[in-house]
């Protein structure tokens, strides 16, 4: 019982991975629109490096959870049959295709057609990666607190909240501005509203879930307080992002960086609660 902090490597891996998948979609769409000058496009591609740094941190964290890099390779033995193997394989493919394509694009070795293909394929791989994360937990019918609609909603809402902000931050770092960027805060705000509703509904549902030895509501006694802090951090993060725009200013990169850090903190709290809610339907008591 607790807040799930003992699973911090998985918290980092899943939250960072979902934000990176969403952030890549934002940058890819900016490049696919075709209204950026060549030098601006190259700056956007250069700023994609931030995505791969975050993804690298996520994979390092996942290896710490597994204990050694060799276990990561061994976990690929059951691709197609194991949700965990599928998650690691899909994440590795997303990271490899995205990273190698980024390097070739940086070196200007991709033709316009190949670059377009790379962007589209990597966007799809990112979404598949997030879905494979969902399946690791949502396919376990003996864990009723994960075997529900709240798991896919929670994971994809992280992508819809963190992705637009991360993409906006990197586009700003690249010196890109445009009317389409103003749509990104609206996506994150909508995701935050939905996430708040999900938190309340999931909290109410916990009272109805129990095994012969355990009550789901007792797994994270501070569920309400933790989720409240999460929503507050997310709301502050989005306010820091949106407030300057309401006054007609472009948010500064340092302010956007603080905003993204606060968003990560909020989502890590939420993901910790998610792992803290692990329980089984049998006689075992989750620790």
From Swiss-Prot:
Location, primary (coarse class): membrane
BP GO terms, sorted: anaerobic electron transport chain; anaerobic respiration; dimethyl sulfoxide metabolic process
InterPro entries: DmsC (IPR007059)
Subcellular location, record wording: Cell inner membrane
Matching Pfam families: DmsC
Record keywords: Cell inner membrane, Cell membrane, Membrane, Oxidoreductase, Transmembrane, Transmembrane helix
Top-level taxon of origin: Bacteria
Annotated transmembrane regions: 10-32, 44-66, 90-107, 115-134, 157-174, 183-201, 225-242, 255-280
Protein name: Anaerobic dimethyl sulfoxide reductase chain C
Native organism: Escherichia coli (strain K12)
Name of the gene encoding the protein in the UniProt record: dmsC
């Amino acid at each position: 019982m607790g807040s799930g902090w003992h699973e911090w490597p998985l918290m980092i891996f899943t939250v960072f991975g979902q934000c990176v998948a969403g952030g890549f979609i934002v940058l890819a769409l900016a490049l696919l629109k075709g209204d950026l000058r060549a030098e601006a496009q190259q700056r956007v591609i250069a700023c994609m490096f931030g995505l791969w740094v975050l993804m690298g941190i996520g994979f390092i964290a996942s290896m710490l959870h597994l204990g050694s890099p060799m276990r990561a390779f061994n976990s690929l033995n059951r691709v197609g049959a194991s949700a965990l193997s599928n998650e690691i394989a899909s994440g590795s493919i997303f990271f490899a295709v995205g990273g190698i394509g980024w390097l070739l694009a940086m070196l200007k070795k991709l033709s316009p057609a190949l670059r377009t293909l790379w962007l589209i394929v990597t966007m799809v791989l990112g979404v598949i990666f997030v879905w494979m994360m969902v399946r690791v937990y949502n396919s376990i019918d003996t864990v009723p607190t994960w075997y529900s609609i709240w798991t896919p909603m929670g994971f994809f809402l992280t992508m819809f909240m963190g992705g637009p902000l991360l993409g906006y931050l990197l586009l700003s770092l690249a010196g890109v501005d445009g009317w389409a960027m103003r749509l990104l805060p609206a996506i994150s705000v909508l995701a935050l509203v939905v996430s708040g509703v999900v938190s309340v509904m999931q909290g109410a549902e916990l009272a109805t879930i129990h095994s012969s030895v355990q009550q789901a509501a007792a797994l994270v006694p501070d569920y309400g307080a933790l989720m409240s802090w999460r929503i507050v951090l997310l709301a502050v993060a989005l306010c820091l992002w949106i407030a300057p725009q309401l006054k007609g200013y472009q948010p500064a990169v340092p302010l956007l960086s603080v905003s993204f850090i606060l968003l990560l903190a909020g989502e890590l709290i939420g993901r910790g609660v998610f792992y803290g809610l692990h329980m089984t339907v049998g006689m075992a008591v989750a620790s």
